[in-house]
Amino acid sequence: EIIDKMKLFYEVIVPYDYLKDILLKHGVKCKALNYWTSSLIRSKPKVIHKTRDPSKLVFLYNGTNDIRKNVTTLTRIFANVLENTEHILIVKTNKPDNLTITKNIRVITERISDEQLASLFNLCDYCVTCTRGEGVGLLHLEGHYFNKPIISHEQGVFKQLGVDIIPLPYNEVDI
């Protein structure tokens, strides 16, 4: 339904090419400003192919730790899922508040360079987020740039835009 509403406009302005490419596939006339986009991608870092080791997977979350992003839930889930494995979740965020930290969860709160961030994306096997409050966020944009599968919630705009994600399981509860 969002796509149909966008088709009513002469042209839709979107923040970056990644979203423009998705919308064009759905017949929406649009252009990208590429003004507010990832400084990481603007720096055009090298993408290094990595062969996944199924016994030692590396998951990456890159974003702020705030209520809307649901990072506390993400680390709590991964603490249980990764227990007794060699898999690792790397959380690159602004603050460690209320995050579950185990031997399988590494939290980075320091500012890092785009080169260091590119290394994290090249190192990981999957990008992961638990947020339901993003349109198509920077993690999706950056993960796509580095050819990483994205594990994400499929509610809202993700599903309607046809963003290529591995959906998180969920149950809807009547309130």
Which sequence ranges carry the predicted segments?
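Aromatic "clamp/platform" in nucleotide-sugar-dependent glycosyltransferases that forms part
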Residues: R132
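Short beta-strand->alpha-helix junction loop in the catalytic core
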Residues: L33-K44
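Short hydrophobic beta-strand element within catalytic cores of glycosyltransferases
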Residues: P149-S152
